[in-house]
Amino acid sequence: MDSSTATATTAPFIDHTDHVNLKIDNDSSESRRMGNYKPSIWNYDFLQSLAIHHNIVEEKHLKLAEKLKGQVMSMFGAPMEPLAKLELVDVVQRLGLNHQFETEIKEALFSVYKDGSNGWWFGHLHATSLRFRLLRQCGLFIPQDVFKTFQSKTDEFDMKLCDNIKGLLSLYEASFLGWKGENILDEAKAFATKYLKNAWENISQKWLAKRVKHALALPLHWRVPRIEARWFIEAYEQEENMNPTLLKLAKLDFNMVQSIHQKEIGELARWWVTTGLDKLAFARNNLLQSYMWSCAIASDPKFKLARETIVEIGSVLTVVDDAYDVYGSMDELDHYTYSVERWSCVEIDKLPNTLKLIFMSMFNKTNEVGLRVQHERGYNGIPTFIKAWVEQCKAYQKEARWYHGGHTPPLEEYSLNGLVSIGFPLLLITGYIAIAENEAALDKVHPLPDLLHYSSLLSRLINDMGTSPDEMARGDNLKSIHCYMNETGASEEVAREHIKGIIEENWKILNQCCFDQSQFQEPFITFNLNSVRGSHFFYEFGDGFGVTDSWTKVDMKSVLIDPIPLGEE
């Protein structure tokens, strides 16, 4: 978006100095709890304007991008050593260009996989680690035993490796692709983490020090690819072996995809303000956060249907969540859940106006999305949506009963319900409905398969680690940390370490699920991984979803609003 366009529209952020919460429910004198969420910092006039005033990519840039794409294809086709091929794939993926070169990447990785008999990587820590990570990442199994050559007879990693920072960093990143029970990778992670932490401040190469610091904050396997691409484009520009063709194409492609996303944001913002849900004082008004999450899950332009429907269902879901958490009485919530189970508006007149509005928004939007899927995909997804909504609201209902009854469940009971109440089974099923092969394939998501189970459980636990203090202050349902404290008598610090350990172990299980879930193909496997990565983005350092004026706004603005400067042609 150029400066004239930005001036003609409004600023992306809004000043809430004079903000007054609007209350829809004037027919009830009953005292209601409030979520105490601050109003959205995002200016909805600005967001709606993106439908027209999005970042238009100039024709000369489109032509240049096609030319550069051809040059990169030639790179893939040129003879090169296996390590060079892996490094090309790694850079292309981290720059966010993998959607442009899916075939070339698969062919390159499969050729490296087939070329494994001569052990060309043997004794080379960086090559062994990069090969392991990239091949496992794309579903080609490599055993952990490839790292035995770097261990002593006592199974400890060789201290000589500490001087090989690039190799240590590659080992560190590879270790997060481990499965449960892979002890060599556990040792690799501990070893690499310890010595990278000790060394990074003294690394002479600035680009390498920057990479190490970034990785220690959060490993690549746990990062949102689209956000990582924005960061890596800037970091890559400073690297000593930077390829200018790849860098230029990455900048152009990033802006081209961002333009598509901006247009979608504008159209979705127009829909959102017509629902009236943005005026509810007790609920989060988080359309752009919902879009960021859908973009985390499925940023590729070809997943427009999945992306938009995840935002629509997710935005309504957030308000339904807040209604169960802080607004409705137990009797009202029981009646709401009953109406969802029947999928009927017949008896919602018994509900207060606000809950009627929420129910009708949920009901109508779900049916609209079902109609769109029928039109664009040719099958009926509404029965699958209804099943997911019923399970969602029953999970909310159970949490509300715990709260109103003053009950603190054991951690296991909480977790089994919480992996549904977090909302990701519903959101991922929404994404799956948008990409399924046919209507019969929709049966695969009921009952919940392991892939969805573990990705949703991870999102629940990561969410709890970030939001528990805020939600406890509001008097909401207890979270996993507090369930464990109540069950065992542990301190909060000990409980947090325990939940952190569960998160790490469940990541290993999810990694293995990506190989074992043969009934699902790409891209749904990646959708699940990306949903957890989105949770790390929003909750790793607190509540970056509910608290809109947080560290996340900087990344959201750089990914969704601000194009990358292209400099001189």
UniProtKB/Swiss-Prot annotation:
KW Amino-acid biosynthesis (keyword) present: no
Catalytic reaction list: (2E,6E)-farnesyl diphosphate = (1S,5S,6R)-alpha-bergamotene + diphosphate; (2E,6E)-farnesyl diphosphate = (+)-alpha-santalene + diphosphate; (2E,6E)-farnesyl diphosphate = (-)-beta-santalene + diphosphate
One annotated GO molecular function: magnesium ion binding
Domain of life: Eukaryota
Coiled-coil parts of chain: none
Pfam families hit by this protein: Terpene_synth, Terpene_synth_C
Positions bound to Mg(2+) 3: 463, 467, 471
Enzyme Commission number(s) of this protein: 4.2.3.82, 4.2.3.83, 4.2.3.81
Family annotation (InterPro entries): Isoprenoid_synthase_dom_sf (IPR008949), Terpene_cyclase-like_1_C (IPR034741), Terpene_cyclase_plant_C1 (IPR044814), Terpene_synth_N (IPR001906), Terpene_synth_N_sf (IPR036965), Terpene_synthase-like (IPR050148), Terpene_synthase_metal-bd (IPR005630), Terpenoid_cyclase/PrenylTrfase (IPR008930)
Membrane spanning stretches: none
Cofactor note: Binds 3 Mg(2+) or Mn(2+) ions per subunit.
CDD domains (alphabetical): Terpene_cyclase_plant_C1
Motif (DDXXD motif): 321-325
Binding site for Mg(2+) 1: 321, 325
UniProt free text on domains: The Asp-Asp-Xaa-Xaa-Asp/Glu (DDXXD/E) motif is important for the catalytic activity, presumably through binding to Mg(2+).
UniProt similarity note: Belongs to the terpene synthase family. Tpsb subfamily.
Task performed by this protein: Catalyzes a mixture of sesquiterpenoids from (2E,6E)-farnesyl diphosphate in fragrance biosynthesis. Catalyzes the formation of alpha-santalene, beta-santalene, epi-beta-santalene and exo-alpha-bergamotene, as well as traces of alpha-farnesene and beta-farnesene.
Designated name of the protein: Santalene synthase
Organism: Santalum spicatum (Australian sandalwood)
